[in-house]
Amino acid sequence: MNVLLGGLVIFATFVTLCNGSCYVIRHKIVPGETIKECTDLKGNKHPLDSRWRTEDCELCACRDIEISCCSLVSTPVGYDRHNCRKIFNKETCKISVVEKTDPNRPCGVSGWIS
């Protein structure tokens, strides 16, 4: 029974870690033309085969047929929403969960969704 329970915990952790928030932007391909750079959603140009972090805490990559971007932010789940609140730090791309009455005291979080 303990082996089964341990396996389920590992599986649940794996599913949580793999539940990423990503999207893809396909290039407009013109026959006979070669892609040398990518243009992101804000109009910024990036060299082919480059990677960058956006202001919105996403990690993006420029490839020959698309730009792919994935969120770097993990969202807390399973915490006391009545007594605690989330604080987002845009510089570190992290969310912390703290007590509403004392923001210096962290709250317990049972899981994170990436």
Curated annotation (Swiss-Prot):
What are the disulfide bonds?
22-70, 38-62, 57-93, 60-69, 84-107
What does the UniProt keyword field contain? Disulfide bond, Secreted, Signal
Q: Which GO CC annotations does the UniProt entry carry?
A: extracellular region
Which InterPro entries does the UniProt entry name for this protein? Answer: PSP94 (IPR008735)
Membrane is among the record's keywords: no
State where the protein is found: Secreted
Signal peptide feature range: 1-20
Top-level taxon of origin = Eukaryota
State the family it belongs to.
Belongs to the beta-microseminoprotein family.
What's this protein's name? Beta-microseminoprotein E1
Which organism does this sequence originate in? Saguinus oedipus
